[in-house]
């Protein structure tokens, strides 16, 4: 029995070390017409959820610049990668990837538009608006293991755009 226990403990330790927690969360854009569900009434709940889940990575959708500022200031253990979809900078919704900066560092990152011209701001196929994919190569600070994380938000109207966005 002692030999079996001795073998189980290192295996469990190994499994815990290699665990990565990733969440995806559509936080809904900051819309003043949302009545009781306006951003000011949701933001603490969203921040608290992310803190309580303590993910290594959080791919968020429909994030406006003002929401991004709040989350960046509120989530002290996290930094993010991503750009606004309307100009490749700060305008329009972001699909940011928040990452635990105490555990991971960014080696490279970029954004592409879900369209036939992915390198520039563009609306794809029958989509109702610009759609983007944010991605990054991350390295675990302790283990030096690397991984790619991608985050996107497909169009809610264009069937063809949703299909082509998977290519």
List the model feature ranges, each with a label.
Residues 36-41, 127-130, 160-164:
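Conserved phosphate-coordination/catalytic loops
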Residues 57-148, 154:
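Structured beta-strand-rich core segments of catalytic domains in phosphoester-bond hydrolases
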């Amino acid at each position: 029995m002692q030999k079996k226990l001795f073998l189980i403990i290192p295996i469990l330790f190994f499994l815990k070390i290699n665990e990565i927690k990733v969440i995806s969360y559509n936080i809904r854009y900051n819309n003043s017409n949302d009545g009781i569900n306006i951003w000011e009434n949701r933001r603490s709940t969203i921040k608290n959820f992310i803190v309580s889940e303590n993910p290594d990575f959080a791919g968020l959708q429909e994030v406006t610049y003002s929401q991004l500022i709040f989350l960046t200031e509120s989530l002290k253990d996290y930094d993010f990668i991503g750009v606004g979809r309307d100009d490749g900078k700060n305008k329009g919704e972001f699909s940011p990837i928040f990452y635990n900066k105490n555990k991971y560092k960014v080696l490279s990152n970029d954004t592409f538009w879900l369209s036939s011209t992915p390198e520039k701001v563009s609306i794809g196929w029958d989509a109702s608006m610009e759609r983007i994919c944010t991605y990054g190569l991350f390295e675990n600070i302790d283990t030096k293991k690397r991984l790619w994380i991608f985050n996107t938000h497909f169009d809610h109207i264009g069937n063809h755009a949703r299909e082509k966005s998977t290519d």
